[in-house]
């Protein structure tokens, strides 16, 4: 499998950093996946979504999660996020404090593909 950068230069990452009620971690993940993989997820319908998000669980604190995804336009993401909030997905009930708001970061450095391709050849 070819190496690829985690994100493309000039795009944006949304990074949600939140905690889940420790008594409901498995239920949170199940409900999140049901919503995320369902046909009603408005995020998956946008051309501005470059790479689908990944839900990441902290190995040091299993109640802490990050949701990270790549977008070409964070204003589009912010507008769609308002729609998502109005939908009141069931997984939100397990987010401590109910706050599910991302920070946005611009990708200012990403390894060029030709360098990754050369590195891959040396691994083989």
Regions found by a protein language model. Give the residues of each.
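Short beta-strand/turn micro-motifs at beta-sheet edges
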Residues: 1-6, 53-57
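Acidic/histidine-enriched, glycine/proline-rich intrinsically disordered or flexible terminal extensions
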Residues: 4-7, 106-124
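Active-site-flanking beta-strand signature of metal-NTP-handling nucleotidyl enzymes
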Residues: 11-19, 66
């Amino acid at each position: 499998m070819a190496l690829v950068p985690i994100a493309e230069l000039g795009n944006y990452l949304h990074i949600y950093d939140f905690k889940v009620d420790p008594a409901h971690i498995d239920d949170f993940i199940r409900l999140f996946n049901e919503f995320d993989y369902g046909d009603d997820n408005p995020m998956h319908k946008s051309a501005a979504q470059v790479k689908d998000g990944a839900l990441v669980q902290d190995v040091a604190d299993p109640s802490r999660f990050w949701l990270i995804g790549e977008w070409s336009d964070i204003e589009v993401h912010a507008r769609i996020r308002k729609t998502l909030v109005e939908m009141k997905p069931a997984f939100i009930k397990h987010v401590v404090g109910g706050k599910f708001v991302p920070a946005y970061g611009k990708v200012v450095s990403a390894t060029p593909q030709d360098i990754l391709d050369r590195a891959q050849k040396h691994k083989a």
